[in-house]
């Protein structure tokens, strides 16, 4: 009975170790070390064309260049189609994208991108109280 207990406990420890190893593994293409500083212009934000501005920096605060970023704007409620635009790098690590906000209210801005090293980048920002013209 002592040998069966040792085998059973060993099996449990192996399963736990595998589970911990899988749980601690960083998913590929996670862009964990990238910081995104987000701005929107003009202020206050009004219905019509706006410019989405953001800066990408790495873990040591160097600009992240060469990213391909799509900007998506969604109303926070159902019933309106999202709007999309491609961001352009205007200087190293600084990206801008025009985006038409067609309705007053709260918007969610999503960044979908690929960094120059192939890592994926996904970020979300809330833009509250877009004012009517």
Regions found by a protein language model. Give the residues of each.
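Coiled-coil-like amphipathic alpha-helices with heptad-repeat character
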Residues: 2, 20-21
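Short, flexible active-site loop motifs that bind/organize anionic cofactors or intermediates
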Residues: 3, 14, 59
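Bacterial N-terminal signal peptides that target proteins for export
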Residues: 1-11
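Intrinsically disordered, low-complexity sequence elements enriched in Ser/Thr/Gly/Pro
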Residues: 5, 23-24
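N-terminal soluble domains immediately following signal/targeting peptides that reside
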Residues: 24-133
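Bacterial N-terminal signal peptides
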Residues: 10-20
């Amino acid at each position: 009975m002592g040998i069966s207990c040792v085998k059973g406990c060993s099996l449990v420890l192996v399963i736990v170790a595998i589970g911990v190893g899988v749980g601690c593994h960083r998913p590929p293409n996670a862009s964990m070390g990238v910081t995104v500083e987000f701005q929107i212009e003009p202020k206050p934000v009004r219905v019509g064309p706006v410019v989405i501005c953001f800066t990408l920096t790495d873990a040591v605060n160097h600009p992240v260049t060469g990213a391909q970023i799509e900007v998506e704007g969604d109303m926070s409620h159902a019933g309106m189609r999202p709007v999309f635009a491609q961001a352009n790098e205007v200087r190293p690590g600084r990206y801008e994208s025009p985006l038409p906000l067609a309705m007053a209210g709260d918007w969610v801005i999503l960044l979908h991108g690929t960094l120059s090293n192939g890592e994926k980048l996904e970020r979300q920002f809330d833009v509250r109280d877009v004012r009517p013209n």
